[in-house]
Amino acid sequence: MSIAVLDRPMSRQDTPSASSVPSACDCMLEVRGVGKSFPGVVALDDVRLRVRRGTVHALMGENGAGKSTLMKIIAGVHAPDRGEIRLKGEPVVLHGPLDALNRGIAMIHQELNLMPYMTVAENIWIRREPRNRCGLVDHAELRRRTQALFARLAIDIDPEAEVRTLTVASRQMVEIAKAVSFDSEVLIMDEPTSALSDVEVHHLFRIIRQLREQGKGIVYITHKMDELFEIADEFSVFRDGKSIGTHAASDVTRDDIIRMMVGREITQMFPKADVPIGDVVLSVKNLCLHGVFRDVSFDLRAGEILGVAGLVGSGRSNVAEALFGVVPASSGEIRLDGERVSIRTPAQAMRYGMAFLTEDRKDTGCFLNLDLLANMEAAVLQRHYMTCGFVRRGALKQDCEAMSRTLRVKSPGLHEEIQNLSGGNQQKVLIGRWLLTHPRILILDEPTRGIDVGAKAEIHRLVSALAGEGVAVLMISSEMPEVLGMSDRIMVMHEGRVTGIVDRKDASQVRVMELASR
């Protein structure tokens, strides 16, 4: 299967005029001619960036464009191969993340780095704990400091709760509070809203505006255009490891940014084709999981894309996990082609032709220390490529390479560790893993979370093509344009129950939000 995206070379006339260059006195952070290479990949090539005091500077670019690599260099995680970093006009050499923190640079990573079995307060003040006269940790003072920090940021989380008990969104807020606690001059946020609800995003933006008013320089990596126009003063675009340009957010349009990011025009963001809808493949009736969701009923047909919408905590992901046997339902009925089945494990679900892309690629998707081949073959090795106890390595590698090309995975090759890839390319590998199983039913939980605009269009085109081949698709998404643009019908959930199923022709953002808040 091939993915077609109309490419048009970008000319200089497509690029908006650059914003004014910041003066030396208000430049908090400057990057000059930085380059960085990894085995087989040039991650950064002569990159330049300036961040002014009291501004939010957004970074935009496709996955693999070099944004996160540059931020890790600024935060002391990686050392540049060449180039220079300046803080307040003075050149610096960073000798690790702790050195960067001591110099006033804090970073909130895209993949959260909290200790799950430590409390919230312990995570925030780790290696900076207040101590009593005996040299022991003063837990009362630790709690007081955390409460004061949370009060300042309007965060409602118990300081003594273990991090492992928190939702992903709450963990993200703890990471943000931890970064703020260092009182850093430069704060780097890498996709900070990827797991947040709309309410939590607005809360985060209030915090960012507060920090901006205090004169902080904030670097904000995002793929979301709406966020750029709402919160950013300036933005820089990266493409293929190079800085394309810096502009005032008020000077450009959405189409300008897309052309700068991908170097081409994307003619159709949601290429949903009208395909014949077949017979019911999956029928769910009164499915329940005690304390999580109840009485969930719906049908899914061959060739149909059934979108699932709802606010964070509505139970959407839990239903997907129950269908795939990750956390089996406590009651209810699942039928495949009219036959009642019991799905208690993922292995059983796979035997019935089901595939499941989880929402958390780091914890439940990728084997981070293994290469692309191992990650892609994980679901098919024993079932499709074993003969008399021997693995048909040639056929396996050939199919994985073909899938990698189809999905346009950017990597040095199949033997590159997946942890070295950008989040978007990791997501493509996981999608490839499940497509190799040739599923009849494909469950996608946030398939384009953390994906750049070009890759989103490719994945949307792929999903539409799969539906055209008769695959039944259940697609969970928190992005309203994606749900409205890609779905034949939309099932809406609120507090663990289905509040309505809307046909494509009757669906609107207002209608879906009404059902999601019932």
Swiss-Prot record:
Annotated TM spans: none
Membrane topology note: Peripheral membrane protein
Database matches in Pfam families: ABC_tran
Domain (ABC transporter): residue spans on this chain: 29-265, 275-515
Reactions catalysed according to its record: D-ribose(out) + ATP + H2O = D-ribose(in) + ADP + phosphate + H(+); D-galactose(out) + ATP + H2O = D-galactose(in) + ADP + phosphate + H(+)
Disulfide pattern: none
Primary localisation category: membrane
GO MF term list: ABC-type D-ribose transporter activity; ATP binding; ATP hydrolysis activity
Keywords, sorted A to Z: ATP-binding, Cell inner membrane, Cell membrane, Membrane, Nucleotide-binding, Repeat, Sugar transport, Translocase, Transport
Localization of this protein: Cell inner membrane
PROSITE patterns for this protein: ABC_TRANSPORTER_1, ABC_TRANSPORTER_2, MGLA, RBSA
GO CC terms: plasma membrane
Positions that bind ATP: G61, E62, N63, G64, A65, G66, K67, S68
Family: Belongs to the ABC transporter superfamily. Carbohydrate importer 2 (CUT2) (TC 3.A.1.2) family.
Function recorded in the entry: Part of an ABC transporter complex involved in carbohydrate import. Could be involved in ribose, galactose and/or methyl galactoside import. Responsible for energy coupling to the transport system.
Record protein name field: Putative ribose/galactose/methyl galactoside import ATP-binding protein
Native source organism of the sequence: Ralstonia nicotianae (strain ATCC BAA-1114 / GMI1000) (Ralstonia solanacearum)
